[in-house]
Amino acid sequence: MYSINRIGIHGISNKILSRPKFFHSSSSIFSLNQNLNNFKNNNNYILNGYNKITHNHHHQTLFHRHYSNLKQEQENKQQNVGKNSETSPSSTTTTENITTATTATTKTDIKETQNSTMSMLKTVFKYLWPKDNNDSKIRIITSVLLLLSAKVLTVQIPFIFKDIVDSLTTTQSEMLTLPLGLLLAYGAVKITSNGFQELRQTIFSKVAHDAIRDVSCSTFKRLHQLDLTFHLSRQTGSLSRIIDRGGRGINFLLNSILFHVVPTAFEISLVSYVMYTTLGWEYSALSLATIAAYTVFTVKVTKWRTQFRVKMNKMDNEASNKMMDSLINFETVKYFNNDALEVERYHNYLKEYDKASLKTTSSLSFLNFGQALIFSLSMTAMMIMAAQGVVQGNLSVGDLVLVNGLLFQISLPLNFLGTVYREIKQSLVDMDHLFSLLNLNPKISDNKDSKPLKLENGTIVFRDISFKYNDSVQVLNNVSFECEGGKRIAIVGSSGSGKSTLLRLLYRFYDVSSGSIEIDGQDIRGIQLESLRKHIGVVPQDTVLFNDTIYYNIAYGNPNATKEQVENAARAAHIHEVILNMKNGYDTVVGERGLKLSGGEKQRVSIARAILKDSPIVFYDEATSSLDTEKEKLIMDALRELFKGRTTIMIAHRLSTIVDADEIIVLGTGGIILERGNHQQLLELEGKYRSMWLAQQ
């Protein structure tokens, strides 16, 4: 029962349209009408069942769907290494486009899109009709031809039934042969038509999947190109949902336009023309009037129903976000014994969803009744006209069947016009959110004059730099210092003094507000980002690991490293023996964000990863803060030997780890340099550093 709820009405539409069961063995007008009524009753039963499931079981379905969203969101977060490192005091204010993109999944209302429909269709067409892929073009052309052929064959079915019924009124000798031939013809047409439709689906599905994959990969690539400001201001899970919904929107739009809207228009035109030439203009005019009334009613009611669907989706998203937030913070909930509070809050969101869902259900019933009323009145009028023609001798009994069959033929695709219309509108919104992401330009990027870093001795100069996050307070203020190539510089200071910001500026997560940062005389703003970051190894303060094996997480520092190199890096980080004592050794999966490992183990994996990267410039941001004193000394001694002769910048709170630094810089509030010198010189100053040192003894 949950599957119907998740598929939705358009999914039921696809199932019904791809496997019609009417006309199966009827050989008279009475059987035909009975099959018609049975189909409509079954259709109403499906829709009513869908509504009941939505009303009675949406709590369970929401939970399963929300939990699936949580797992998907967590899996996508694992793709982003280092994004959740020490949070800056940055404002969440971003550009309008970024705000729109990151909050898109909480705004499921059907609204005007930022990108024009035509521009989005052109973008999709580029992926659907790639210049260098003739296979996709052949598949599309073949699919369209198969579809049109299936429609032409389908229109022949009412004519075959007409001939069957007419043949039953002939002499006994003729009836022995003619109906058998017509019934065989009916079977052949039916089988061929269904075969064409299924073959079309098989041929086109690869094209759609390729297009969606290419768009999703392009968007994912763009997300990794965007700057840290964007990722710090995003909503949890929103990016993965934008990509997921956008991909599904493209898939639905392609299938609905190519295989529903266009074929329906073709079929209506064909049926109207057949009615005009076979039965007369009155029948054609009445059928077109019926279609017009049906379309206008469906579109207007669907627009009216949208407000209820918007509210329902909003409550769905809020309940989903609440559940994700609660499960992600599972330990916090337990620490404060607030299980009942979390359940109550989740229940309140579901109650609001209930209200919106009931309105959606009742409005759907009104839509279904109105659609049925329009077609029933039209069907009745046409049957009266046809019956009069039979009585007057102008039409045969078979023509009565023909009228019934032709009108029913065009009622099938129109049966789901409201759903298709609404879903197309929603698909355009979802695609707009996806393409808004795809069209975002990073604030930090290469320019046309960017060049690879030409490393000589690795001298780094921070020249009179100032920086603040958006409109927040000044983080760094006219800071200047030089780290000579091969030297070890340590930076200390109170929390919020801008120590970690120096790393983000050096790595170009942000650009300085004023001043410059140079490596061997080259302004880093003129260096290609990939080249710059390739030359800098980082051990972040907050170690975030992929939900993969320990081996994978260490080898991430150099994906081309051999097993021996990975193990040597682990030995240098003093974690090799710890790994071997685990049940699965290097194949041990570390869990979401590495939570199956202790803080010290995660930090040593991070150190091993930096060792494996083997960069000429190394930046430690509280690299051993989670280690005990003994392990810290062992690792620092090993790192000192490994990175001897390399430019090293260390951020530390434990001053004992930096006593041998060539220079120590003490930052104060506002990013001002208070003191600088080596360990002994700073102790003799009897200033900030000395007081910090004495406090730790």
Curated annotation (Swiss-Prot):
Residues 77-107 have a biased composition (Low complexity). It comes from the Eukaryota. One of its GO terms (molecular function) is ATP binding. The chain crosses the membrane at residues 140-160, 176-196, 252-272, 279-299, 366-386, 400-420. GO terms for biological process: culmination involved in sorocarp development; intracellular iron ion homeostasis; transmembrane transport. It is found in: Membrane. One of its GO terms (cellular component) is mitochondrial inner membrane. Pfam families: ABC_membrane (PF00664), ABC_tran (PF00005). Residues 73-111 are annotated as: Disordered. Keywords: ATP-binding, Membrane, Nucleotide-binding, Transmembrane, Transmembrane helix, Transport. Residues 460-695 form the ABC transporter domain. It is a multi-pass membrane protein. Residues 140-426 form the ABC transmembrane type-1 domain. ATP binds at residues 493-500. Belongs to the ABC transporter superfamily. ABCB family. Metal importer (TC 3.A.1.210) subfamily. This is ABC transporter B family member 5.
